[in-house]
């Protein structure tokens, strides 16, 4: 009798994705972040669902409903802080996952890579709208500043902003629609994840060497199920440590002040995971130019398969490209730091130089270094 997991229509899909999936035998811990992102998405959907049961999306009661969750709901405080810090974990895993894709040349699977970029945009949109919901000072002013950027679009900009606001300023209509979108987007993300995996399983996983590994594959279960479980335990431990010991470490104290349209906070800044993009936005004096640079800071990832000039896929054996990759990482950390600083000397010039270097590295230096490495290897 054939095993049910190989014959049943539904079990067969699960079996081919998680059990009998042929997997390269040498993939390292950097390949753990895909499953960790799945775990983060699951945590966010479950905690978010319970928060939505108690939250009210009205400007008069939103702030107090979040306070009510923390004070009066059974274990509401842990649900709220797991959701808030879960977002930070989500982005840590996202950045590491994308970084791994760049380092090991996984972007050559262009369909998987492009769906991944769509996912990144969707998660960023979800996180932005989620940050508006507690209706604190930074929620309100963050929403005002970021939605206002759309007014830079020629001709339709102003109408577009008012259409998104549902009025002449960020108000009740804006909060209600942001809550609706924040609720639905994670499910759209989950569907996109399925498409992401569908395309990945068409080709199979890449591996650290970047060489086709068809000759040396092992089943996903038990080898990588065990490995992923270890990753889950480490991620949950880190998340719980953050939630239980320092839940407000990554938040902004201004968000504990209810939203007040008449009082602007001294420094409007987004959550830490958007600071690099915010620094790029601020480094260009022109409004439309800044908005374009902001979008391109993520969209530039789509150009990676086109800019790949090396004869090797992975950076594992390419020291010049490795050096440039780590300079890019340092540059992104610099941008993250600059995004949290006030707009004054010397931060302005540092931000402009770091923004220029970010695009210059990806568009010019990395493709040239690959060509040099080809020459050195007489290819």
UniProtKB/Swiss-Prot annotation:
Subunit relationships: The cytochrome bc1 complex contains 11 subunits: 3 respiratory subunits (MT-CYB, CYC1 and UQCRFS1), 2 core proteins (UQCRC1 and UQCRC2) and 6 low-molecular weight proteins (UQCRH/QCR6, UQCRB/QCR7, UQCRQ/QCR8, UQCR10/QCR9, UQCR11/QCR10 and a cleavage product of UQCRFS1). This cytochrome bc1 complex then forms a dimer.
Residue spans crossing the bilayer: 33-53, 77-98, 113-133, 178-198, 226-246, 288-308, 320-340, 347-367
Gene Ontology cellular-component terms listed: mitochondrial inner membrane; respiratory chain complex III
Key words, A-Z: Electron transport, Heme, Iron, Membrane, Metal-binding, Mitochondrion, Mitochondrion inner membrane, Respiratory chain, Transmembrane, Transmembrane helix, Transport, Ubiquinone
Superkingdom of the organism of origin: Eukaryota
Species whose genome carries this gene: Ochotona himalayana (Himalayan pika)
The protein's name in its UniProt record: Cytochrome b
Cofactor note: Binds 2 heme b groups non-covalently.
Sequence positions that bind a ubiquinone: 201
């Amino acid at each position: 009798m054939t095993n049910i997991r190989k014959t049943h229509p539904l079990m067969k899909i699960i079996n081919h994705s998680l059990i009998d999936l042929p997997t390269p035998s040498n993939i390292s811990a950097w390949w753990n972040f895909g499953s960790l992102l799945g775990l983060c998405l699951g945590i966010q959907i479950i905690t978010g669902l319970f928060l939505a049961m108690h939250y009210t999306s009205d400007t008069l009661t939103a702030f107090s409903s979040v306070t009510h969750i923390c004070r009066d709901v059974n274990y509401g405080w842990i649900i709220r802080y797991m959701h808030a810090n879960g977002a930070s974990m989500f982005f840590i895993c996202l950045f590491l996952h994308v970084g791994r894709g760049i380092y090991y040349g996984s972007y050559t699977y262009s369909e998987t890579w492009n769906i991944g970029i769509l996912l990144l945009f969707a998660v960023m949109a979800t996180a932005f709208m989620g940050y508006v919901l507690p209706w604190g000072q930074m929620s309100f002013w963050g929403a005002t500043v970021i939605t206002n950027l759309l007014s830079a679009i020629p001709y339709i900009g102003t109408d577009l902003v008012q259409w998104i606001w549902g009025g002449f300023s960020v108000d009740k209509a804006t909060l209600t629609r942001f809550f609706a979108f924040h609720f639905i987007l994670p499910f759209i993300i989950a569907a996109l994840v399925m498409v992401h995996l569908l395309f990945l399983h068409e080709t199979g996983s890449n591996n650290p060497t970047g060489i086709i590994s068809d000759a040396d594959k092992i089943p996903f279960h038990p080898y990588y199920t065990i490995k992923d479980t270890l990753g889950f335990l480490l991620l949950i431990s880190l998340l719980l440590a953050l939630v239980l010991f320092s839940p407000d470490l990554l938040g902004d104290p201004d968000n504990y002040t209810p939203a007040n349209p008449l009082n602007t906070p001294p420094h409007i800044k987004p959550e830490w995971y958007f600071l690099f993009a915010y620094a790029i936005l601020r480094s260009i004096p022109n409004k439309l130019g800044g908005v374009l640079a902001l979008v391109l800071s993520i969209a530039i990832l789509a150009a990676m398969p086109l800019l790949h000039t090396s004869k090797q896929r992975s950076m594992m054996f390419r020291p010049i490209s490795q050096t440039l990759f780590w300079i890019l990482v340092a540059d992104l950390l610099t941008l993250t730091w600059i995004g949290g600083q006030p707009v004054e000397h010397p931060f302005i010039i540092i931000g402009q130089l770091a923004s220029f270097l970010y695009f210059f590295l990806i568009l010019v230096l990395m493709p040239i270094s690959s060509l040099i490495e080809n020459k050195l290897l007489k290819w």
